[in-house]
Amino acid sequence: MSTSSLCRLGALLACLLSTQAQAEQPALRFAVTESTAMPMMQIEHGEAVGGILYDLQSRLAQKVGREARMLVLPRLRVQSMMMHGEIDVRCNVSPAWLISGHHQYIWSLPFMFQHDVLVTRANMRHNKPKAGERIGTVLGFGYAALEARFLSGDLLREDVRTQDQVLEKLAARRYDFAVANQLTLDWFNRHLAADKRLVRIAEIGSDPLACIIRNEADVPTQALLRAMVQMKEDGELDAILARYR
């Protein structure tokens, strides 16, 4: 057998061994809240199929030699599963959003910032919510800048399940104002005529988004943390974000 044939055979065997080793390791369980919308995550029939988080989480798992199992779940279910160690990684989360601490988890570096904005329609005559105004919001989400007005009844929450539903109801004139994140707003507007687009009034909050990783022996925690740093330094994180802007 020639030297070149031996080299090709060696490469094939190495690939097969790597694939076998990956198959023997348990899949990493990534939590995805069902309220997430594009461009962060595309969810079809209860399954995660694309978006920023899909690409990020798939790449993270690949870099540590694991498969990614993405679990689309209600927000409260995610919190409960994390408390019981049933989630390995959760991305698209900020420390300020968690009700209770998770001592068995470690935070990664932030991979982006989420900017929450107050939104209305392009043809609205007034650009500030009046007393008693209904505001489109996502069920279970907190909005610190508006919380006092919600608690006093000066503004009224109109909760729906997902980010894109908030904007769809605003466009359909079910209410005149809503809160969304800037990325989801831009995605919603991308194919609309100028007079049909929803417009940003003001930014009401900004939070760093990171991944929180279970720190147990069956999870390659440090390898995942290093992978995030490497993806940041190599420009992979920026490249993923750029695909959806």
What does each model-found stretch correspond to?
Residues 24-101, 130, 137, 159-160, ...:
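Extracytoplasmic small-molecule ligand-binding "clamshell" domains
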Residues 67-69, 145-161, 229-245:
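Ligand-binding clefts/hinges and TM-proximal coupling segments of bilobed small-molecule sensing domains
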Residues 71, 76-88, 164-184, 191:
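Short helices/loops that flank or line small-molecule/ion binding pockets
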Residues 115, 119-138:
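Flexible hinge/capping segments at coil-to-helix
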